[in-house]
């Protein structure tokens, strides 16, 4: 069974896909579905660590209620990820491993440079440390 960390579905109907993305080789960490044009699995776009890193990572330091002091997060900008899959929706529905779900307007993800973090302070995030992916 694959590890699905996040399910980003768009509050719109699914359209026919326009492009085939490369299939991941490693363990799947992220599954995107909904109103996306580019997929690599039936109606979905799935990613492992390597395929996420190929999109280009950014880092920034911030404080948060989840970590002590200033923390460096490194990950893929959600804006870039949404462009890569050809997302056409306006809302991201994000579901974590523990079934916690939240909704983020896509415009907020773009306006505030939200990232999908893979690393915290230079280390890959583990499940027990809020990983393996974390929306920041």
Give the location of each predicted region.
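N-terminal intrinsically disordered, low-complexity segments enriched in P/E/S/T
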Residues: 19-136
